[in-house]
């Protein structure tokens, strides 16, 4: 145990020395959030979906005319390039309905163009929202264990970095198999991958916000658990005989102040998470729709390839089939991760901890604060529903999966009916 503690302190010291001076202030989780926030803003600007910038002189986000011109140029070039490719493939008959990856790419092009319009229209609202969030003040006031911080950080990396990396490797294997000229492999892969990355950027921003919100909820619950244990212990017969009423009243007042502070942080995090959803709801709904269509179309094309192999004795490429399965598994994995982190596990945990308080011999002010905190948890009703259509929780995965399976069964039944009617 001592060895692990020494190694942890050593890694933390190396981490502190490797950071730029601007990132060294604050606690470990604040430093990680600062770095991730800088990276997110940079990527949003690079892809042209964000028209603002952070002013170090004014210490807030501001609208930028220069970045607006840059974003217009990026979006125009992006739209012209992919619209010309789509038109060229339609006019020459190169678009094949069995090319799942190509059609999925062009569906994400539509999502990208829609995201450009919606994000530009909401730029001023987003900037006002960013400037109104005292994020680092809240983070610095919380004590979060390094294990929880790194777990959340790795979970975010899995969604934002490793899933696109798996998709990119899959596309390289796919294009090396389907395109003979090796010099065009990287160009084709990049052309296919870019819409997938840009269309997913807004969703990644919301996912990062949920990771951060869960981090704050976990810290609040950890502190709340300690308060529950101490408050219930102060009301035990042994402690009531051991301490005078004045000491217990003073301690209950101190615990009430701590609960008041936790209630403010909980309310701030829950309300801002729900408010941030309105900036990304259209992108999330469209992405889920495209993923549903892509998964259904990919599974149906796999069925057609297998049916042609066994019924019409056509060749079946097992390697391309495996590559396609991996490619379609990535968006489904991303959906599972979003549904899992959006589940109200931590907020329900807050309500359960508040119900554990024994208020029989507690101070009047402490009772009032506990009841107010409980009322806040109940009235906020922390449910994330983009456009009010579907709630983001674990049941969303079952709904998407059942929808894909239902559509797939209808298509397979129609195809089998057509095949055997022709015979």
From Swiss-Prot:
Q: What protein name applies here?
A: Putative gustatory receptor 97a
Describe its function: Probable gustatory receptor which mediates acceptance or avoidance behavior, depending on its substrates.
Q: Does the keyword rRNA processing apply?
A: no
Q: What would be one Gene Ontology cellular-component term for the protein? A: axon
This chain is glycosylated at: 343, 393
Q: Membrane side Cytoplasmic: which residues?
A: 1-31, 87-99, 174-200, 300-317
Q: Which family does it belong to?
A: Belongs to the insect chemoreceptor superfamily. Gustatory receptor (GR) family. Gr22e subfamily.
Source organism: Drosophila melanogaster
Q: Which InterPro entries match?
A: 7TM_chemorcpt
């Amino acid at each position: 145990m001592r060895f692990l503690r020494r190694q942890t302190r050593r890694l933390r010291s190396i981490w502190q020395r490797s950071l730029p001076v601007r990132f060294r202030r604050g606690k470990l989780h604040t430093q990680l959030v600062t770095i991730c926030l800088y990276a997110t803003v940079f990527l949003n600007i690079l892809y042209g979906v964000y028209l603002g910038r952070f002013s170090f002189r004014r210490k807030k986000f501001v609208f930028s005319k220069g970045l607006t011109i840059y974003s217009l140029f990026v979006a125009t070039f992006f739209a012209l390039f992919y619209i010309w490719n789509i038109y060229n493939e339609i006019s020459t008959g190169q678009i094949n309905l069995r090319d799942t990856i190509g059609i999925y790419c062009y569906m994400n092009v539509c999502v990208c163009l829609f995201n450009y319009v919606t994000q530009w229209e909401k730029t001023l609202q987003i900037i006002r929202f960013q400037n109104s969030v005292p994020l680092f003040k809240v983070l610095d006031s919380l004590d979060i264990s390094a294990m929880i911080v790194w777990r959340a950080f790795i979970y975010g990396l899995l969604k934002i970095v490793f899933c696109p990396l798996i998709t990119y490797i899959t596309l390289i294997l796919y294009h090396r198999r389907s395109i003979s000229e090796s010099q065009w492999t990287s160009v084709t892969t990049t052309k296919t991958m870019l819409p997938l990355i840009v269309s997913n950027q807004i969703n990644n921003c919301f996912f990062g916000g949920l990771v951060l919100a869960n981090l704050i909820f976990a810290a609040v619950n950890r502190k709340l658990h300690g308060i529950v244990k101490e408050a219930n212990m102060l009301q035990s017969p042994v402690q009531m005989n051991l301490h005078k009423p004045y000491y217990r009243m003073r301690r209950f007042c101190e615990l009430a102040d701590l609960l008041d502070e936790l209630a403010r942080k909980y309310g701030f995090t829950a309300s801002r998470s729900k408010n941030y959803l309105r900036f990304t709801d259209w992108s999330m709904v469209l992405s889920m729709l495209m993923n549903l269509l892509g998964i259904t179309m990919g599974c149906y094309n796999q069925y057609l390839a297998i049916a042609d192999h066994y019924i019409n004795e056509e060749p079946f490429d097992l390697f391309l089939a495996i590559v396609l399965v991996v490619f379609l598994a990535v968006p489904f994995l991303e959906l599972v991760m979003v549904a899992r982190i959006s589940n109200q596990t931590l907020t329900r945990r807050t309500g359960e901890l508040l119900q554990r308080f024994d208020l029989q011999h507690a101070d009047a002010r402490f009772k009032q604060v506990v009841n107010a905190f409980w009322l806040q948890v109940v009235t906020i009703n922390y449910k994330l529903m983009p456009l009010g259509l579907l709630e983001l929780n674990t049941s969303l995965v079952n709904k998407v999966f059942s929808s894909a399976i239902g559509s797939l069964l209808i298509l397979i039944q129609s195809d089998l009916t057509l095949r055997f009617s022709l015979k």
